Regions:
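Short, hydrophobic/amphipathic alpha-helical patches that form generic packing surfaces
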Residues: 274, 488, 502, 522-531
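Short conserved micro-motifs at the rims of enzyme active sites and ligand-binding pockets
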Residues: 128-130, 186, 195-198, 242-246, ...
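Aromatic- and carboxylate-enriched substrate-binding clefts and catalytic-loop regions
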Residues: 332-509
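Short, flexible loop/turn elements at secondary-structure junctions
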Residues: 75-77, 88-90, 121, 236, ...
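Glycine-rich, aromatic-lined ligand/substrate-binding cores of catalytic
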Residues: 508-557
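An acidic-aromatic substrate-binding cleft motif
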Residues: 223-324, 328
Length: 557
């Protein structure tokens, strides 16, 4: 304590890395802020050392070795209790808040978490703008003092975005001091809590946590006992150790799925790049400017001739996957509703059950299985999350009925319920519910546009992939600078693997965009960005022109 104010600091190799920084919460709805008036009532220390085996991952086994300290605090005037737990590893520190069911603090509403990270100087930073709804920005490299002048230019257009501050950034944030110390700030075990951003005071070079609000502007609704996510600091003098750190995984709970025999890596191709690059479409018909799930007559609609998820085309991808040893074929645009799926804030966009007339779900799955290939389901929600939860069990059961064991989910557009954000407490709970419910059906999940991962793949290893960053699709939307992929392993991938969807061999897209890459650059991504889920994203015919390079994907991915 600094007087009655909770604080902490971090040193590494005798150097101060985090200067004395305050801890606590501002409360809403009449609650007294948990920022001061504290006394220490107890301290407990311990050491823990284990080796655990992940279901999948870069390492066959992982050592989890740390020193633990629990500081029990009491706010004297309110009889409220707030504990802070620290775990110190060789490669960094984690801290979290723990609220026991004790005293007068039973329910409270968070106005803001006030965890500080006081930097020792004007460090170099690799960052993306703080945003409640998207992480799909290119990374910018500046000094901390350069964030404010550069932030406006760093904000690119997205279908859903809410930038909150001129100095706000997202985690995982990678920093480097002038004397060569690397600092990575992120969070671990994000459960029942809004995602954390960081807001910089560029006069003092202090970051303060900034949580994602709900539709009412509140940051979180808490009931004791509860534990916050971990606030993580990976600290090293060797950049390679940032990449090899398992601190975030170790701060998550052990696997909660008893039987994991059905969880496995997946190498796949898919009906996806056709639509992204402008060659085909998700929608079946141009007959209707608007469609309704229970009222549109697709049987008598005229096919547009551009619908990519048709029987013949899907068979072509199945044949290609089987011929080259791929596990699966993703098919997007198989289900009704795509004609007006985005931009209209519709609640009932998809039912996740009804295929278009030219997609025979039974026959195609039987054909794929006969070739030793599985289809990957696609559940684009258009961010209507309550509608998805309404259909979720029926949609997962449909998958089991036809032999699917993996789903790619999507959350494009503004969140419904209206006014909510992609990273608010409600949505964090939804994303985890989709994963845990999928586990009940033995289904693996690859979530796109969801919150950036925080190591929960240790606890729920059926979460085999996330997008949660600017991926390959943006190469068809005007291009991405090559340096972006070089920083992703130090930032976005710190919390878990990314479904980056590499493997583009034809750089000129049908929509006129040009991919800022090369075939060698695309092949390198299979090595530099680990994922148990790897896509060869281009068209079969483009791979057939370069079978020598394609062999690398077959051998390495």
């Amino acid at each position: 304590l600094d007087g009655t104010v909770p604080t902490y600091s971090v040193t590494y190799q005798g150097k101060t890395i985090i200067k004395p920084s305050r801890l606590g919460y501002q409360l809403a709805k009449g609650g007294k802020d948990l920022l001061s008036d504290f006394s220490v009532i107890n301290e407990k220390t311990s050491t823990f050392d284990e080796t655990w085996t992940p279901v999948w991952g870069e390492n066959k086994s992982i050592r989890n070795h740390y020193n633990d300290m629990l500081v029990e605090l009491k706010q004297n005037s309110t009889d409220s209790y707030m504990n802070v737990r620290f775990r110190v590893y060789d490669d960094g520190v984690g801290l979290r808040y723990e609220f026991p069911q004790k005293g007068n603090l039973n329910y409270f509403t968070i106005k803001e978490e006030r965890t500080e990270f006081a930097m020792t100087g004007d460090h170099t930073a690799w960052w993306i703008p703080g945003d409640y709804d998207t992480q799909e920005y290119e990374y910018t490299k500046t000094r901390l003092s350069g964030i404010r002048p550069a932030l406006h230019a760093a904000v690119s257009s997205n279908l859903s975005q809410t930038v909150f501050s001129d100095t706000g950034v997202q985690t995982s944030l990678q920093l480097k001091t002038d004397d060569g110390i690397y600092i990575n700030l992120h969070e671990a075990a994000l459960v029942d809590y809004p995602a954390m951003h960081l807001n910089l005071d560029d006069k003092t070079m202090t970051f303060t946590s900034w949580l994602t609000p709900d539709a009412q502007g509140m940051k979180g609704y808490m009931q004791t006992p509860f534990k916050s996510p971990w606030r993580t600091m990976v600290i090293t003098d060797d950049a390679r150790k940032v990449l090899s750190s398992n601190l975030i995984l170790n701060l998550n709970e052990p696997c909660k799925i008893k039987d994991t025999s059905w969880i496995h890596p997946v190498k796949y191709v898919g009906v996806w790049w056709e639509m992204i690059s402008g060659k085909g479409e998700w929608a079946y018909t141009h007959d209707y400017p608007t469609v309704k799930l229970d009222g549109t007559d697709y049987v008598h609609a005229k096919p547009s001739g551009k619908h990519s998820a048709n029987n013949a085309n899907v068979r072509r991808y199945i044949d290609f996957a089987a011929a080259h040893g791929f596990d699966a074929v993703l098919v997007e645009g198989w289900n009704i509703g795509w004609e007006d799926w985005s931009g209209y804030m519709k609640e009932k966009v998809f039912d996740f059950l009804t295929p278009y007339p030219d997609f025979d779900i039974k026959t195609l799955n039987e054909y794929a299985h006969s070739k030793g290939v599985k289809l990957i389901m696609h559940h684009e929600t258009s961010s209507s999350v309550m509608n998805y939860e309404k259909y979720m069990d029926r949609a997962y059961q449909l998958m089991k009925d036809y032999g699917y064991d993996a789903v790619k989910s999507g959350y494009v557009g503004n969140i419904i319920p209206r006014g909510e954000h992609h990273y608010s407490q409600l949505e964090i709970n939804h994303y985890l519910h989709a994963v845990t419910r999928a586990a009940d059906y033995h289904i693996m999940v690859n979530a796109h546009e969801a919150v950036r991962p925080t190591g929960l793949c240790r606890t729920y290893p059926n979460l085999i992939g996330n997008e949660s960053a600017r991926g390959t699709e943006y190469q068809a939307f005007g291009g991405t600078k090559p340096g972006h992929t070089a920083i992703l392993p130090f930032t976005r991938l710190q919390g878990g693997p990314m479904d980056y969807t590499p493997g583009i061999f034809e750089m000129d897209c049908a929509n006129g965009s040009h991919c800022n890459s090369t075939i060698c650059g695309q092949l390198a991504l299979y090595v530099t960005m680990y994922s148990p889920l790897q896509m060869a994203a281009d068209f079969p015919e483009n791979y057939e022109k370069h079978m020598d390079a394609f062999q690398f994907i077959k051998d390495v991915a």
